[in-house]
Every structure is written in structure tokens, then in C-alpha cells.
A protein has these predicted regions:
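Short, solvent-exposed aromatic-acidic interface loops
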Residues: 284-295
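Extended active-site neighborhood of metal-dependent phosphoesterases/phosphodiesterases
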Residues: 72, 77-180, 251, 272, ...
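Beta-strand-turn-beta hairpins that frame and shape the catalytic cleft
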Residues: 1-7, 16-19, 143-158, 188, ...
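Short catalytic/ligand-binding loop motif for oxyanion handling, primarily in non-cytosolic enzymes
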Residues: 15-17, 68-71, 101-105, 165-167, ...
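Active-site glycine-centered loops adjacent to acidic/histidine catalytic or metal-binding residues
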Residues: 11, 64-65, 97-98, 198, ...
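Non-catalytic terminal accessory segments
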Residues: 1, 294-442
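His/acidic metal-ligating clusters that form di-metal
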Residues: 53-59, 91, 155-157, 166-256, ...
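N-terminal active-site segment of His-dependent metallophosphoesterases
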Residues: 1-72, 172
């Protein structure tokens, strides 16, 4: 691949400052939201200003979920920021995704959630024409997928798997045929190609393979199509996670999926990627950092992490709540136990041996820490750590349940080892970092 460098950021979820973000309805919503809404405009502006100051890198790529929920005012505000960034000399390429058009455009005022003007999928082309579409050498009207030659001999295949006219995360047969046609054309023109897609193609962590909305549908077929037709790198988002994963097709061809976190929520990273004349690709993660708000002495990363951790915990507790009769009673007891118990308490109830250093830790704190660590990348709780050993013993205790579940998870002839998937989700066995990595491309 010819030398190229660019900034990669995704899931900006821009929310226009002119829209309301206050009151009880907003506060209740934020209890389960992993990323910031009120702060989003300042975060985007701050990061864009920093990127604008880099005079050596002139390409910026943003793979979808540009706004909170397609609010018309949010699109206007975000596009204004894009134009300011373009004036600094940057070439900007975007794709849109489900949060950029839907039926859930709201603001929050006077303790209420109020509907505001949204955006249709058909409007997105004209709104973002100057940020990729106008430079397209091939364009798929149904999905707004496109191909652009971002520098001499290097083309970007922008796959929109989140269009209005198909199930979310779908690269259907028609679009696959279009993709193959574009890759064959690039090869005949002597160009190398990398791809972008909002949804991860390769599941970011093993357990996400079981979650339909966590990766593209029929992901192995899509990954093989790309790898076997010359695409070695795809840049993704959607899951708000820092991850880098490799997939090899049956023909032995590799695809590297670089998934980047939400810009406005923990882990709050963006990336700078360079490919040199020897086809060495370097991936660097950059902290969002200070964005000009008074955080009352709280460190910026802690500010992001606290919101994320609390939201994860609240979602789990909310999932356990509700129900009627015996089921409701059991769920209520489980929720109460999780809120109050330490890890040591749980270990005694289940007769599980744990490291004494974990015993006094609140169970809610451990859940938040593990969840946050998964999304930050590099999943530190590998074999040999107290956390890994505790989870392993917990899963062993419930092995009879897992064995009953596993056959139901089998799909397309692929059997699942649920215990292994869960343990490899909290502890990485990759030979490279999810944050900063280096690969030699073909």
C-alpha cells in the first residue's frame, strides 16, 4: 500500500448546545447512558482544534453515528464543525449510521423529554455531500456506500451497513456484489484499498459474537469477502470499544478490524494511523483530554470513566429488576444482594475460593471495573490474575447451566465454548495491544 496517514474518530454523537439538556428527565436518562450529551459539542470542538493544528496529517475519517439521535440542529452544529476543520486544510470522509436518522430525536427541558425535528436517511446525502460523497468515484444509492481515492493509489471503501432500507448491521447479497465489483475495479486500476464500516466486522471481544447488534450480520462471510479481495484493514466503531482483531479467511487471507471508542464517552479515544513506504501500519491511540469544562477537580479520564462505569452497573441492575410473582421477588432479592455484597460475600455464598485482596471489594465496583476494562481495550484480567481466577471459578460453579445453554448458541455449524468466550472477553490473548500497535501489510 502506498504511504498514507489519517486521523480516525468515531461515534461523535454530537448534540447541539441549543437543544435542552437539563431537568429530571435528562438526569434519569443519563443514569444509563455511557457517553456525555451536554458536553459533546465542547469535546468535538476541542478534538477538532487539536487535529487542525497537525499540519502533517491532512485526512480525517469518521465512520458513523455523527449525532446523538439525528436531531436536525445537531447535524447543523456538527457540519459547522466539519467545515471549520476543512478550512484548516483537512480532507474529511464520513459515513452515517443509525443515530444519524431515526424516530428518537429529543431534547430535555423543564423535567420533560420533548420531541424535536429529526432527519431522514434521504436528507443525509445532501447534508454530508462535501465530506466524502462529492469525492466518490463509485456510489451506491440505496445505502450511501461509496469509494473514494483519498491519496494516489489508495482507495477507501466506505460500507454503510446501517441504512434505512435493511436490517441494522447488514451487508446483503446485493451490496456484497457491489463491493466485489469495486474491489475488482481497484485491483485492475492498480490501487490498494482499505475499508470503513460503522459496525465492527470482527467481534471486538469473543462474547460479542453472540450479540447480533455488536457486529455485522454474517460477519465471517463479509470478512472473507473483504480479505479474499485485497482488503487487509477495516476501520469500525459502533460498540464504543477500543479493540484490534485479526481474521483469516479459509484461503489464508487476513483482515484487521480496528474498532475505535466513542469520542464523547469512556474510553474517550481517537486514533492516528500511518502506513509508510514499507507498508508498515502504525496505530496510535490519543486521549480526548481537556475540553474546557470545569470538572471541579476531577481528572478528565476519571470524569469519563465514572459516567461509563455507573451506566454499565445501572443497566445490569435495571435488567435484573421487574417481573411479577416469584420471578419478580427473586430479581428484587438479586438486585439488593448485588448492591450491598462484597466479592467475599458472593464467594462464601457460592463456596468459591478467591484471592484475599478481592474479598473486601464491593461487587458493584468489580462489575464496573471489569466492564470498563473490556471497553478500554487490552482486557487486563488474563489467566493468573485474581479477577480471572474468580470469574473462572464462578463459571465452573455454574457449568451445568452453561452446558445447557451452549447448544442453543450454535449457529451455522459453529459450536460455542461459552466459558472460554467469557474468560477471553475479560482477558486478552492477542499478541498486540488494542491501543497502540504495528502491523506489516502486504
Amino acid at each position: 500500500m502506498n504511504p498514507v496517514g489519517f486521523y480516525l474518530l468515531t461515534d461523535t454523537h454530537y448534540f447541539a448546545p441549543c437543544l435542552g439538556a437539563e431537568g429530571k428527565a435528562f438526569e434519569n436518562y443519563m443514569k444509563k447512558e455511557q457517553y456525555f450529551i451536554k458536553e459533546s459539542a465542547s469535546i468535538v470542538e476541542s478534538v477538532f482544534n487539536r487535529i487542525a493544528d497537525d499540519k502533517e496529517t491532512d485526512i480525517v475519517i469518521i465512520p458513523g453515528d455523527l449525532t446523538k439521535n439525528g436531531e436536525k440542529e445537531s447535524h447543523k452544529g456538527f457540519i459547522n464543525e466539519l467545515y471549520k476543520l476543512r478550512e484548516s486544510g483537512k480532507k474529511i470522509y464520513v459515513i452515517t449510521a443509525g443515530h444519524d436518522y431515526n424516530e428518537w430525536s429529543y431534547e430535555y427541558r423543564n423535567d420533560e423529554r420533548l420531541e424535536v425535528e429529526g432527519t431522514s436517511f434521504d436528507e443525509l446525502y445532501d447534508l454530508y455531500r462535501d465530506f466524502g460523497y462529492a469525492d466518490a468515484i463509485a456510489f451506491d444509492k440505496l445505502t450511501h456506500s461509496y469509494v473514494a481515492e483519498i491519496t494516489g493509489g489508495v482507495r477507501m471503501l466506505a460500507i454503510n451497513c446501517d441504512a434505512w432500507n435493511q436490517p441494522k448491521g447488514t451487508v446483503d447479497e446485493r451490496l456484497r456484489a457491489w463491493i466485489k465489483e469495486q474491489l475488482e475495479k481497484a485491483k485492475s486500476d492498480g490501487c490498494s484499498v482499505f475499508a470503513i464500516c460503522h459496525y465492527p466486522v470482527i467481534p471486538s471481544v469473543p462474547v460479542f459474537d453472540l450479540v447480533g447488534d455488536a457486529r455485522v450480520n454474517e460477519w465471517r462471510r463479509v470478512a472473507s469477502l473483504l480479505a479474499d479481495n485485497g482488503v487487509e484493514v477495516i476501520l469500525t466503531g459502533h460498540m464504543h470499544i477500543q479493540s484490534i482483531n485479526e481474521f483469516y479467511s479459509e484461503n489464508g487471507n487476513r483482515l484487521i478490524d480496528i474498532c475505535t471508542s466513542c469520542l464523547v464517552g469512556s474510553p474517550a479515544k481517537y486514533r492516528k494511523i500511518t502506513i509508510d513506504e514499507k507498508s508498515v501500519m502504525k496505530v496510535e491511540s490519543i486521549d480526548v483530554g481537556d475540553f474546557g469544562w470545569n470538572l471541579n477537580g476531577v481528572e478528565v479520564q476519571d470524569y469519563f470513566d465514572e459516567q461509563f462505569g455507573q451506566a454499565i452497573l445501572n443497566k445490569i441492575l435495571n435488567a435484573l429488576s421487574g417481573g411479577k410473582g416469584a420471578v419478580g421477588f427473586i430479581r428484587k432479592c438479586a438486585t439488593k444482594f448485588i448492591r450491598k455484597a462484597t466479592v467475599g460475600t458472593l464467594s462464601r455464598v457460592l463456596f468459591i475460593r478467591i484471592d484475599k485482596n478481592l474479598a473486601k471489594k464491593k461487587l458493584t465496583a468489580l462489575i464496573s471495573e471489569i466492564g470498563l476494562a473490556i471497553f478500554k481495550g487490552d482486557r487486563p484480567y488474563a489467566d493468573g490474575t485474581p479477577e480471572y481466577d474468580a470469574v473462572s471459578r464462578l463459571l465452573r460453579r455454574f457449568s451445568f447451566v452453561i452446558k445447557k445453554i451452549e447448544p442453543k448458541l450454535e449457529k451455522d455449524g459453529v459450536k460455542r465454548n461459552l466459558k472460554e468466550m467469557l474468560l477471553n472477553t475479560i482477558g486478552s490473548n492477542n499478541g498486540f495491544s488494542d491501543a497502540n500497535a504495528e502491523f506489516v501489510l502486504k
